[in-house]
Swiss-Prot record:
Name the UniProt record assigns to this protein: GTPase Obg
Organism placement in taxonomy: Bacteria, Bacillati, Cyanobacteriota, Cyanophyceae, Synechococcales
Species the sequence originates in: Prochlorococcus marinus (strain SARG / CCMP1375 / SS120)
Cofactors (names): Mg(2+)
Record localization: Cytoplasm
Highest taxon in the source lineage: Bacteria
GO cellular component terms attached to this protein's record: cytoplasm
NCBIfam families: Obg_CgtA (TIGR02729), PRK12297.1 (NF008955), PRK12299.1 (NF008956)
Annotated signal peptide: none
Class of enzymatic activity (EC top level): hydrolase
Length: 329
């Protein structure tokens, strides 16, 4: 399935039905006169969060969405039927905002949560409303009002407590695959991950915690270079970041600095988010060089480093214990 996490659509609520002009003229109806009914109200446009959806793909080719119009009034003071609401299902984590002003209509994060974004127009009045002592046979009625119309921007921000970040080929997809049941595409070349991957990792209590692995960052990602900037929004909601570093890289310290700079440049308080620095692929270094690298990192601003081998499932218990303790703070 194609992963679409942004969409631009126009929504228009239904127009209210018109009131009508009608009269009761039956000889057996002593209180005859104007009997035109009111028009029905137009239908609303409603968004609803659905935990079974993972993408905004449905809106890629459906860019104008209309709710049903109200029906015109009927004789005998009958009100026309209101238009049906149109309910648009979106993934949990979808933010709905007005495209031109940026005003946020709502943020749908809970399964089943609903949000009315465009209200239908009010139905018009029939001539029965205009009966008076001066006018016993009014011909006046009103038309229904137009429904609200908005140009909207939909943005999906995945709901994950833990985000795994790092440069391409740091081993993020391997890590999430061994920690959870997620099965992302894994290969030994950069940019294997082209979309975010989600995996559920079980705590000792049995509760599940959602982890997100986003495509690798590169220098300049926050300014739009590479793939990672497209998906940094998906770690905005996380409580904890795992900064994964390839311990066997030519310059791991420089790699760390690149990612830290991108977090700072992106904003949204990502640089202040609690995180754990994890050296991966420790199986590719001898013990002496690994210790040397750990000491060098500990001498800087990084107080604690965890070394693992994701592919060999080594050191994962220590990492998970640290994650659970951080999330409980």
């Amino acid at each position: 399935m194609q992963f679409i996490d942004q969409a631009r659509i126009t929504v228009k609520a239904g127009r209210g039905g018109d009131g009508i002009v009608a009269f009761r003229r039956e000889k057996y109806v002593p209180a005859g006169g104007p009997s035109g009914g009111d028009g029905g109200n137009g239908g609303n446009v409603v968004f609803q969060a659905d935990s079974n959806l993972q993408t905004l793909l449905d809106f890629k080719f459906k860019q104008i969405i209309l709710a049903e119009n109200g029906r015109r009034g009927g004789p005998n003071k009958c009100t026309g039927a209101s238009g049906n609401n149109i309910v648009l299902k979106v993934p949990c984590g979808t933010e709905v905002r007005h495209l031109e002003t940026g005003i946020i209509f709502g943020d749908l994060t809970i399964d089943g949560e609903s949000l009315v974004v465009a209200f239908g127009g009010i139905g018009g009045l029939g001539n029965a409303h205009y009966l008076s002592n001066r006018n016993r046979a009014p011909e006046k009625f009103t038309e229904g009002k137009d429904g609200e119309e908005w140009l909207l921007h939909l943005e999906l921000k995945l709901l994950a407590e833990v985000g795994i970040i790092g440069l391409p080929n740091a081993g993020k997809s391997t890590l999430i695959s061994v920690l959870s049941s997620a099965r992302p595409k894994i290969a030994d070349y950069p940019f294997t991950t082209l979309i975010p991957n989600l995996g559920v990792v079980r705590k000792p209590s049995g509760d599940g915690t959602v982890f997100a692995d986003i495509p690798g960052l590169i220098e300049g990602a926050a300014e739009g270079i590479g793939l990672g900037h497209e998906f940094l929004r998906h770690i905005e909601r996380t409580r904890l970041l795992i900064h994964l570093v390839d311990a066997s890289a030519l310059n791991p310290l420089e790699d760390i600095e690149i990612v830290e700079n991108e977090l700072s440049a992106y904003g949204h308080s990502l640089i202040d988010r609690p995180r754990i620095l994890v050296l991966n692929k420790k199986e590719l270094l001898d013990a002496k060089n690994l210790k040397k690298l750990e000491r060098k990192l500990n001498q800087g601003s990084i107080s604690e480093v965890i070394s693992i081998s994701a592919i060999m499932s080594n050191g994962l218990d220590i990492l998970l214990n640290k994650i659970w303790s951080k999330l409980e703070i």
